[in-house]
């Protein structure tokens, strides 16, 4: 199983970029031939996440894992375990074409072996590709201890409803206050989810599984829950985050607060109470509060309004915990940058004003809402816990 650092490479900074060769500053090589192949491949990079999505829907990664630890298996062996592919004699051939791109992208390992087959009565030696799991794709296999994988999170970000928003991305440049998701679907994303049960489940499932792996990292590097007696998770979805905190620290009374259509499908957890409401109208009273991946959904004005609602419901000495991927001041070709930059673009496509922020920008939000102190605690690859103290 991958480490937390490897898990947080999910937002795009892994070896998927290996398919892009070096592009020089010049448009022409020394003999005057344009680098058409390299430039054209940039436009074809969509093939990688689409191949990845198909592999997840076909359950490829779990099937490979069932062949054993460090197994190297062929497309034909994998296809033989797919019930829906048994009647397609070309299933293995098409599957191999999907998997070899994932192999070239280091999402799977790929090697070549020789085998003898009978062709027209003659034995012929052919080359066959074998595929195995890498650190990246291990995260897509359900863990034995709890069944968690990142498949649900990746299925959300590659869902057609989400992808359709990116076809309208240029409108944010051309039209003031334009939101690509709203242009594509005629509704705000949370309103859309409230009326579309399938999308509501896809969104909730994606957020829930990623919350689990994030809190495994948070628990390793943050000890601020030790002295808490109560924690209100504002915008907590179906309650996965606060349930994990209460399970780890059972003396904490947990409250999960979100919109009615979200709370209506939230499961019951020991030590957690579900409360429905609108955080922009009023936040319930609480000794401490959690905002995980909430502020990045909204513009500065809405964030300050929400934080003021939190401030009003906190006692003196109470605090709000912000959990977000933080934009580094210096950007680079690294996980810390990509873990913020890629969801930043996703937020720009989905939600009005949604964006990732630097530590100083979060500090400005806290001060504008009345908080007297901001304490950032780095966790892993750009993930931070940021404390706002009243």
Swiss-Prot record:
Pfam families, per database record: Dimerisation (PF08100), Methyltransf_2 (PF00891)
Binding site for substrate: 153, 296-297
Gene3D superfamilies: Vaccinia Virus protein VP39 (3.40.50.150), Winged helix-like DNA-binding domain superfamily/Winged helix DNA-binding domain (1.10.10.10)
Tissue: Highly expressed in capsules. Expressed is stems. Expressed at low levels in roots.
Keyword Cytoplasm part of the UniProt annotation: no
Keywords: Alkaloid metabolism, Methyltransferase, S-adenosyl-L-methionine, Transferase
EC number: 2.1.1.117, 2.1.1.-, 2.1.1.89
Broad class of enzyme this protein falls into: transferase
Official protein name in the record: Scoulerine-9-O-methyltransferase 1
Organism from which the protein derives: Papaver somniferum
Upper classification of the organism: Eukaryota, Viridiplantae, Streptophyta, Embryophyta, Tracheophyta
Gene: SOMT1
